[in-house]
């Protein structure tokens, strides 16, 4: 990688499909907001989806061409929230350092379930700080090169 900034297409956020629940019951018609930021939050992309009548949601992949150099550590802040009874609830927070699809966890989460009444799980298992109210059964292997 060059020390001078050059444009590169990167995956800011992999697609995410799952089920949003509260005390085990699907939350329907609920807005899920995603904010992706980089360069110390001076640049960002924001979008949202609404859960369907079964509580399912599908956030699409977000790709963007950004200028990168060898002098700057690549890191994307991923924040996913919803609001319930007037309270903003953090569902997912991660600092993504991989530029590829499904680089967040090293694979595609299978059977992703996000339970608003659960405690936040905080871990460093995926090379970066990670907080989530979501669980999954397994990670579907995914390979790509950076």
Q: Where are the model-predicted features located?
A:
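Glycine-centered loop-to-beta-strand initiation motif
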Residues: 18, 45-63
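Charged, amphipathic alpha-helical segments
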Residues: 1-2, 56-70
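A short, structured loop/turn motif at beta-sheet edges
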Residues: 21-28, 50-54, 82-87
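Short aromatic-acidic-glycine turn motif
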Residues: 38-45
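A short, sequence-level motif marking secondary-structure junctions
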Residues: 34-35, 53-54, 64-65, 93-99
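A short, Gly/Thr-enriched small/hydrophobic beta-strand-prone motif that recurs across taxa
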Residues: 9-21
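Short, ordered, surface-exposed loop/turn motifs in non-cytosolic proteins
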Residues: 25-37
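Feature of secretome-associated and extracellular-like proteins
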Residues: 1-9, 41, 69-146
């Amino acid at each position: 990688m060059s020390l001078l900034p050059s444009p590169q297409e990167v995956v800011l956020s992999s697609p995410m499909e799952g089920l949003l629940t509260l005390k085990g019951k699907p939350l329907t018609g609920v807005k899920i907001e995603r904010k992706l930021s980089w360069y110390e939050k001076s640049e960002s992309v924001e979008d949202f989806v609404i859960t369907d009548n079964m509580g399912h949601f599908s956030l699409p992949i977000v790709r963007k061409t950004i200028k990168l150099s060898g002098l700057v550590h690549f890191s994307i802040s991923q924040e996913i929230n919803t609001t319930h009874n007037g309270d903003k609830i953090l569902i997912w927070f991660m600092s993504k350092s991989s530029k590829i699809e499904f680089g967040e966890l090293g694979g595609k989460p299978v059977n992703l379930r996000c339970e608003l009444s659960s405690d936040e799980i905080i871990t460093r298992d995926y090379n970066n700080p990670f907080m989530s109210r979501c669980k999954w059964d397994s990670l579907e292997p995914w390979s790509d090169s950076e």
